Amino acid sequence: MRASYMFTSESVSEGHPDKVCDRISDEVVDLFFREGPKAGISPWAIRAACETLATTNKVVIAGETRGPASVTNDQIESVVRAAIKDIGYEQEGFHWETCDIEILLHPQSADIAQGVDALQPGTNQEEGAGDQGIMFGYATNETPDLMPAPIFYAHKILRLISEARHSGKEKVLGPDSKSQVTIQYENGKPVGVREIVVSHQHLVEDMTSAHVRERVEPYVRQALPADWITDKTIWHINPTGKFYIGGPDGDTGLTGRKIIVDTYGGAAPHGGGAFSGKDPTKVDRSAAYASRYLAKNIVAAGLADRCTLQLAYAIGVARPLSIYIDTHGTGKVSEDKLEKAVAEAMDLTPRGIRTHLDLNKPIYARTSSYGHFGRTPDADGGFSWEKTDLADALKRAV
C-alpha cells in the first residue's frame, strides 16, 4: 500500500430514502422473530426476505416469509408507521400517518426451503445455506472500533446530528442527510481531514447553505479529532444551496442500495449481497457478520493490524466452500495458519453461525442505519458480531 494517500467514504442518515426502506424491511424481520415464540414457533423456523420501496406518500413491501399466522397485514402496517414516525417524517409528501402502505408478502418457495431446512428435525442433519455467494469481513486497528477511519467518522458525524435532532435541539433539521469524509493518510495512518461534505435536509424552506453550516459544523468538529481539521480543510455544506424536499418524497428509496455504507465505506471488498430484510439463514447477512467477527478478533488478538476475510457458500450446502484471509503484510503469523485457526475456533455452517452469534432474535432494525459494523454490542445480543471474545482462542490456535 502507498504510504501517503487520501481515501473517502460516505454515510447516510436513517432518513435517507434507501435507509427508510432498510429500516422497514428489518422491522418486518424483527416482527416475525418477536411473534414466533408467542405462537409456539421455533425461531429456527422463521424465514423472511422482505424488500421495500418508498416514494411520495407510498410504501410497498414485498417478499417471502414463513412464521406465525398471527402476523397480520394490519400488524405489519402498524410497525411500519411507527418506524416512519420514529425516523421523523411528518411532511406533506411523506407522513407516517397518511402514507399509503401496500403489503405483498407470500410464503417462501418450497424449492428454496428444501435446501435450507434440516431434512429431519431433531437430528444432526445440517441446514444448508440460503443461497450461494461470497461474503467479506474486514478490520483495521486505525480506530478504536477496528473500523476504517473514513467510514467511522462519516457515521459519527451523522449520528451526532441525528441525536440532536431527536432530542429537539435541532428542530430546523429534517431526517434526510448524507456525509462524506476525505481522510489524509501518512505512512498508512490517518492524520487529517482534507474534505468534508454534509448535505442535510432543512425544514425551513429559505435556509441557506450558510445557515445549515451554522447548525451542523459543531457536530462535525465534535465527531473528528480536533487537530484533523485545519485551515486547509475544505467544507461542502449543502453545496447545491437548498435541501428542503427530502426523504422518499424527493428521491425514491429501495432496500439494499447502501451496501457500502452498511459495511466498510469501500475500504474492503464486498460480495454484493445486501443485509436488511433478511433472516439469518441468508448467508448474505449472517456470514458477512461472521466474517467481520473473525476479522475483528484476529486484529483484536494482535495477530494482524489489518485483516480481510472471505467466506463462500453454495445453496443447500452447510459448510463454507472456502475461507480466505489476507493480512495485507501486517500479519504476525501466516495467512495459512489463520485460515486453519478460524475454522477450528468457530463453526461456520449457517446453523453454527446463528448459534455462535445468537442471531435468532429481533435485533435487526437497529442495524439499518449508521453501519452494521463498528457498533457496541448490546446486552440483548444485538451486534454480537462486534464482540472480541474469540481473540484468546485464535491466539491459542496459532
Swiss-Prot record:
The keyword Ribonucleoprotein does not apply. ATP binds at H16, D176, S177, K178, K242, F243, D251, R257, K258, A274, K278. The keyword Mitochondrion does not apply. Pathway: Amino-acid biosynthesis; S-adenosyl-L-methionine biosynthesis; S-adenosyl-L-methionine from L-methionine: step 1/1. Its cofactor is Mg(2+); K(+). It comes from the Bacteria. It is an enzyme of class 2 (transferase). Mg(2+) binds at D18. Binds 2 divalent ions per subunit. Binds 1 potassium ion per subunit. Its EC number is 2.5.1.6. GO terms for cellular component: cytoplasm. K(+) binds at E51. L-methionine binds at E64, Q108, D251, K282. It holds the Pfam family S-AdoMet_synt_M. One of its GO terms (biological process) is S-adenosylmethionine biosynthetic process. Homotetramer; dimer of dimers. This is S-adenosylmethionine synthase. It comes from Rhodopseudomonas palustris (strain BisB5). The lineage of its organism: Bacteria, Pseudomonadati, Pseudomonadota, Alphaproteobacteria, Hyphomicrobiales.
